[in-house]
Each structure stands twice: as structure tokens, then as C-alpha cells.
Amino acid sequence: MTETSPTPVLDTAQARVLGCLIEKEATTPDAYPLTVNAAQVAANQKTAREPVLNLQTGVVHHALRQLENLGLVRQQFCSRAERYEHRLGSVLDLTRQQVALIGLLLRGPQTLGELYARSERLARFADTDDVRHHLDRLIQRGLAAQLPRASGQREDRYAHLLSGELDVEALQAATARAAQGARSGSDTSELEARVQSLEATVADMQDALAALQARLNAAGA
């Protein structure tokens, strides 16, 4: 697949697993490529995910194999376990910043401020205008889209198109449910995104420690 190739259409599990591989490559390099179990844990994280999923091991493994068939994932064998890494950047000819944005959008629709705050550990962006520049490039290639503002929304939101055409009404309804009871305003949105980023950092550190402990146990066996 290249810039002129058809975009693959992913189901919910495939999209979530691919997004996890993209994020964990940057945030927990010592535990990457991911095992099936690590991919399952990452896919079922509840922070800043829409929708929140509870995928079983077999579903995650099947999603990884299908992504491998699409060329978006490559399997590696090390430490006596299957491990998987993504190939999104090379397959679709994307920059690091564009891969990071796709990885974040695979969590669910987000605003520029949320993308900028959550991208801190994935890729370097100068500011939200820089984020917008890379998003515009993805939009031009049919990989992302800007969503119409729903009633009461103050900011534009963006979504990926790796799962085909968007059901805008369903996305807006899901966004409204997720935002119910939260304070409105861009400053609050960005602050919440930074808090969620810190929570994700703690989770990633726990993942890395668990991976290190597993390797130490294997070495001592």
C-alpha cells in the first residue's frame, strides 16, 4: 500500500489493537513489540477510549493476524513468545507525526487541543497549528476527517477513516455521552487530556516493569 493505494477498512478490534501498537512503540519501547497478552491489556484500557472495550485474548489474537494479512502488522518471535509490531508508517508512507495522530484517533474522535496534549510522548508538535497542518495532510489523503460540530460543542473534532465512512450521528451521540457531566470549554478539555496522559504514563511504566520482571524470570529459569 502506498499513497495511491486503497485504504484498508478495519473493524473495531483491529482498529483498537493497531492504535495500541502505535502508542506502545513510543511509550514502552522496552516492552515492544507487544505480546498478545500485552496487546489485550492495552486494548482494554479505559482512559480516553471511545468506545471502552473488553476484548478477549482470542479476539485480540485474531485481530493481530488479520492486521498481519493486511500488511499493517508484522510478527516477530523473541523470548519464546509471539510479538507484534505495526508497519503503518512504511505501508501508508506516513511521517512520525501522522502515525502518532492516527494512533490517537484510533482511540476515538478528538479535538486539536486533546490531540496536542496526548501526543506529547508520541511525536513532537510545535503547537496546535502544527497538529492541524498534519491533520490536513491526513484529510487530503482520505485517512481522517473533520466532524461537523454537534449542538453545544465549541471545538471541531477529528476522526480517522481506517474503518470506512463515518456514522456522524452515532459518533456525536457517543461523544455527548462521554462528555455528560463534564465541564465545557477548551481549557478544561486540554487539562483533562493532560491528566489522562499522566495516567497513561503510569500505566505504561507498570507495563514496562512487568515486562522487565518477565524477562528476568525467564533469564533465571
Swiss-Prot record:
It holds the Pfam family DUF480. Belongs to the UPF0502 family. HAMAP family: UPF0502. This is UPF0502 protein XOO0245. It comes from Xanthomonas oryzae pv. oryzae (strain KACC10331 / KXO85).
